[in-house]
């Protein structure tokens, strides 16, 4: 099954919501995509993330051949970590659409094992940016950031020199070890939408589009970033507003599973389930293209 990747910029430039919105026009010319995923949307401010997600759903309604997989925005670097925030409630209040059956939302983020220590130290740009974020978050001075960058992350440094410095620091510097550990944790804490797209494809291939993409294990995940119990699951799945959010949960002896397959149109008798909406899309497009 092909995957269409639409470039909206590069890794050195901070992207804005408007940059991501340029991806929709090229996709309107393509008939094959059956789902839209923008995992990077959560890197925007919360309001911009919700606005971009609304554009995703509008695009899906316009095309009538695909569905949006959305992440519930979580602030990875809150101004006051001691204050508990209900991000699901913020999502329900901040995101709105007239076409809820064309979207499904998932929560929480996933602590993954995708990147190793070697993957992190091999990427100078990523290391520089994330070390800077981490140092700023814990309150160190900008002068220390500049010193760290000048000493260890110079453009044009040879691979062997960088490797030697990295090994020396890992063996002798507790602070550096903590930085690498923090960067590794940060980079491996991923929003779930990309993984959920993989779950959809896996279920499509093994069973069919009519099968609910739920009760399915996700690979390369250590644990969800939040623990959800049965009571919280019920509130996520069947809210009064109908904006259902699908949970990702850990079950003893079974591992980590996607536990829900509802669209954001939870109060609809016809379109509350992802597999029903996607099956109808499949049938409509099959007839249209016959």
Question: Each predicted region: which residue ranges?
Answer:
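A glycine- and small-residue-enriched flexible loop/hinge signal that marks low-structured segments
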Residues: 1-290
């Amino acid at each position: 099954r092909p995957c269409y990747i639409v470039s909206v910029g590069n890794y050195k430039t901070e992207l804005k919501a408007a940059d991501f919105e340029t991806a929709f026009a090229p996709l309107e010319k393509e008939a094959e995509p059956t789902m839209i995923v923008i995992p990077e949307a959560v890197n925007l401010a919360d309001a911009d993330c919700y606005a971009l997600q609304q554009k995703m759903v509008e695009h899906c309604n316009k095309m009538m051949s695909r569905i949006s997989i959305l992440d519930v925005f979580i602030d990875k670097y809150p101004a006051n970590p001691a204050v508990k925030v209900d991000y699901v409630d913020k999502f329900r209040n901040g995101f709105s659409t007239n076409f809820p059956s064309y979207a499904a939302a998932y929560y929480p983020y996933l602590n993954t094992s995708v990147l190793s220590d070697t993957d992190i130290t091999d990427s100078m740009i990523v290391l520089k940016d994330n070390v800077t974020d981490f140092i700023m978050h814990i309150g160190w001075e900008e002068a220390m950031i500049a010193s760290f960058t000048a000493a260890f992350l110079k453009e044009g440094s040879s691979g062997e020199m960088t490797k030697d410095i990295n090994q020396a620091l890992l063996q002798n510097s507790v602070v550096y070890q903590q930085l690498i550990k923090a960067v590794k944790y940060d980079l491996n804490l991923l929003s779930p939408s990309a993984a959920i797209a993989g779950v959809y494809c896996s279920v499509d291939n093994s069973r069919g589009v009519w099968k609910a993409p739920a009760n399915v294990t996700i690979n390369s995940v250590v644990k969800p970033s939040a623990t959800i119990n049965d009571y919280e699951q019920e509130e996520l799945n069947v809210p009064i507003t109908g904006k259902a959010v699908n949970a990702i949960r850990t079950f003893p002896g079974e591992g980590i599973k996607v536990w829900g397959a509802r669209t954001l149109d939870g109060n609809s008798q016809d379109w509350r389930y992802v597999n029903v909406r996607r099956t109808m899309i499949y049938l409509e497009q099959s007839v249209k293209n016959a």
